[in-house]
Amino acid sequence: MIPMNDLSRLSVAETEGTFESFRDIVMSGNYILGVNVEAFEKNLASFLDVENAIAVASGTDALLISLRSLGVGAGDVVATVPNAGGYAMTAIRQIGAFPIFIDCLADGQMSADDLFSVVGHSPKIKAVVMTHLYGLIGEAERVAEICSEAGIFLVEDCAQAIGARTDNGLAGSFGDISTFSFYPTKNLGAIGDAGAIATKDKTIAERAKSLRQYGWSSKYEVSESMGANSRMDELQASVLNRRILEIDQINQRRREIWCLFNQALSGSSEVRIIGENGPRFVAHLGVLVTPKGARTQIQELFRDRGISTGIHYPVLDFDQKGFEVGLHRPCPVAENLTSRLLTIPLFPTLTDEEVREICGALSAIKI
């Protein structure tokens, strides 16, 4: 069975480098927020062309701390899409804020037109969380412009889109603050949980840095309320310091595979794969949009050919039983997409033979 991902497919150099780093870190006796973390923060800030990067324990923590750093709290309204897996919602509800949902475009990204409409007619929105879903950067520049004109903070959730870029900058450089996940399956993945925050604003960065460690300004001196214990460890940072040097090549390999999948679908007018061939897309996931009612049939075709599939994501946030959804409004595009999405394997260590087998399955879709 071709898996959705296989994290064990490491090169000899990668494996040896990780073991060597692990040995050095163990011997150093410095395991949390040490020299490797400091180096990674500098490397990430340089890559994004922003002034500040703050390493944290996970992408979800990055969202939570970012919202708190902007002063978002209980009773505030935060705009987000309902189709991005619930990660932004988790952070929004954890700080006591309420979501207002913005519909998406046909590729799953936040609709700037719908955001503009909501900003003009809805209760005061304090922040927008824009998730760059599937590896696309979406309408980041227009969303940033809408937020700036309305005096609304913009949080870019770049968990799936590190390295995606427009002519004017990278994902993570348009908002007031941006968040990253380095969960192992991400384009830039660690070997455990890890995340980061990036911002051009020094004051916001100082708040985020304090909030990641209890709200301390110095050891045992609390200057910010609602602090967390969210620190990146040295091993994760050492892995990320190596892998960030290769992120553009990793993203290019992902795009090359996506292009082959897209070409394999050229004979089908009813099935498409989300993405585009260019720097605005880093091919985090291979997401098909299937005809209404045909997803199960196509899923079975892949299963019969020994190819794993998934759904990103099967339940919209406002349909989740565990969320208090707050200001619910219709999101017809998101609702239509959710029942039609099917994810196929797309990761950089797919073998050429596996890519051919997946392309064969795509070419065999007859709807």
Report residues per predicted region:
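N-terminal "arm"/small-domain region of PLP-dependent enzymes with the aminotransferase-like
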Residues: 1-30, 345
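PLP-dependent aminotransferase class I/II
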Residues: 7, 37-42, 50-53, 113, ...
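Phosphate-binding glycine-rich loop
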Residues: 30-77, 91-95, 101
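Short beta-strand->loop structural element characteristic of the AMP-binding/adenylate-forming
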Residues: 80, 97-107, 310
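Conserved coil-to-alpha-helix start sites within the AMP-binding
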Residues: 83-89
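Helix C-cap/helix->beta junction micro-motif
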Residues: 95, 149-150, 305
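Active-site phosphate-binding strand-loop segment of PLP-dependent enzymes
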Residues: 107-190, 196-198, 343
